[in-house]
Curated annotation (Swiss-Prot):
Role summary: Catalyzes the hydrolysis of N-succinyl-L,L-diaminopimelic acid (SDAP), forming succinate and LL-2,6-diaminopimelate (DAP), an intermediate involved in the bacterial biosynthesis of lysine and meso-diaminopimelic acid, an essential component of bacterial cell walls.
Native organism: Pectobacterium atrosepticum (strain SCRI 1043 / ATCC BAA-672)
Residues at the active site: 68, 133
Entry-linked Pfam families: M20_dimer, Peptidase_M20
Protein name, per record: Succinyl-diaminopimelate desuccinylase
Binding site for Zn(2+) 1: 66, 99, 162
Gene from which the chain derives: dapE
Biological process annotations from GO: diaminopimelate biosynthetic process; L-arginine biosynthetic process; lysine biosynthetic process via diaminopimelate
GO MF annotation list: acetylornithine deacetylase activity; cobalt ion binding; succinyl-diaminopimelate desuccinylase activity; zinc ion binding
Binding annotation for Zn(2+) 2: 99, 134, 348
Pathway assignment: Amino-acid biosynthesis; L-lysine biosynthesis via DAP pathway; LL-2,6-diaminopimelate from (S)-tetrahydrodipicolinate (succinylase route): step 3/3
Origin superkingdom: Bacteria
Length: 375
């Protein structure tokens, strides 16, 4: 298939950029962007490659994304090697095809076409690209945003190319995301022999009622923009592996995906009150991964909705569900942030794939968004 979007997507997929490694993906993008007049600034931190690129001045529309991918798993389960992209029955197969090298290719080709049609565009077109979104996300977008904010860079609109769609391209657009906070809880007891429980203090038994209450609690009811806050236990560990030893400690890790009805501070307070009420001897550490954010209807949302309607004749559903994305960092700059990308049915799975026609369509949507906001 001779199509610049598909050809670039295949070139990117061929590079096994397991997070946080980039494996030359960004160099490929930078070469294309500099050829059409972009200024590119490498902003590497630690083991992570990032770049910030821009062309023009004025109101800024940035396209954000990541070149890293998750591991492929057992490659023998794939119908075709994950880093040897192939098109079969109109589908482009390969690790990162949907998440999110297909989007990156669509963005770059959209920029090339936009600049060719509008060489003297009025606003500023920018790219914020990282190689660490799938793993720790410590040295990626968050560090670039910190650096840009420190020098008072302006960002008005940001389109994140995460795979947002469900059935057809653009049927779902993410105009916000829930916050995420994780608790690492340790319940302290006293180790002993299972035959002499009166000489020990079993932290599993002590914690069970509190954990049941954590699970049963309605944290909030959500609102017009966010579903209710959820709490899920992710890991539990106790014991020595022996069937005759009462454990001395219980480790429980649980995560909240929270709406704007709550704050991370309120969550921590409510959990502490619950644990104290059950008279547990515990220590707890919290890790905040991101605050919730929301982009209300405005110029960016309207431009995205218009582009999707124009090319796919569907009205996007604006949702805030799902996992976190780097949009949570970019929103700190005061920018309107929206996620629009391909269908997410196969992301992180064996035989990850995306419709080649969908990527072509997505690139046209991206171009139309550019034309509406900064032409």
């Amino acid at each position: 298939m001779s199509c610049p979007v598909i050809e670039l997507a295949q070139q990117l997929i061929k590079r096994p950029s397991l997070s946080p490694n980039d494996e030359g993906c960004q160099a490929l993008m930078i070469e294309r962007l500099t050829a059409i007049g972009f200024t590119v600034e490498a902003m590497d931190f630690g083991d992570t490659q990032n770049f910030w690129a821009w062309r023009g001045t004025g109101k800024t529309l940035a396209f954000a994304g990541h070149t890293d991918v998750v591991p492929s798993g057992d490659e023998s389960h794939w119908q075709h090697p994950p880093f040897e992209p192939i098109i079969r029955d109109g589908m482009l197969y390969g690790r990162g095809a949907a998440d999110m090298k297909g989007s990156l290719a669509a963005m770059v080709i959209a920029a090339e076409r936009f600049v060719a049609a509008h060489p003297n565009h009025q606003g500023r077109l920018a790219f914020l690209i990282t190689s660490d979104e799938e793993a720790s996300a410590v040295n990626g977008t968050v560090k670039v945003v910190d650096a840009l904010m420190a020098r008072n860079e302006r960002l008005d609109y940001c389109l994140v190319g995460e795979p947002s769609s469900t059935h057809v391209v653009g049927d779902v657009v993410k105009n916000g995301r829930r916050g995420s906070i994780t608790a690492n809880l340790r319940i302290h007891g006293m180790q002993g022999h299972v035959a002499y429980p009166h000489l020990a203090d079993n932290p599993v038994h002590r914690a069970a009622p509190a954990l049941n209450e954590l699970i049963a609690t309605e944290w909030d009811r959500g609102n017009d923009f966010f579903p209710p806050t959820t709490m899920q236990i992710a890991n539990i560990q106790a014991g020595t592996g022996s069937n005759n030893v009462i454990p001395g400690e219980l480790f429980v890790q649980f995560n909240f995906r929270f709406s704007t009805e709550l704050t991370d501070v309120l969550i921590q307070q409510r959990v502490a009150e619950l644990l104290d009420r059950h008279q547990l001897n515990y220590t707890i550490d919290w890790k905040l991964s991101g605050q919730p954010f929301l982009t209300a209807r405005g110029e960016l949302v309207d431009a995205v909705v218009n582009a999707v309607k124009h090319y796919n004749e569907v009205t996007p559903e604006l949702l805030t569900n799902g996992g976190t994305s780097d949009g949570r960092f970019i929103a700190r700059m005061g920018a309107q942030v929206v996620e629009l990308g391909p269908i997410n049915a196969t992301i992180h799975k064996v035989d990850e794939c995306v419709s080649a026609a969908d990527l072509q369509l997505l690139s046209r949507m991206y171009q139309r968004i550019m034309e509406q906001l900064i032409a």
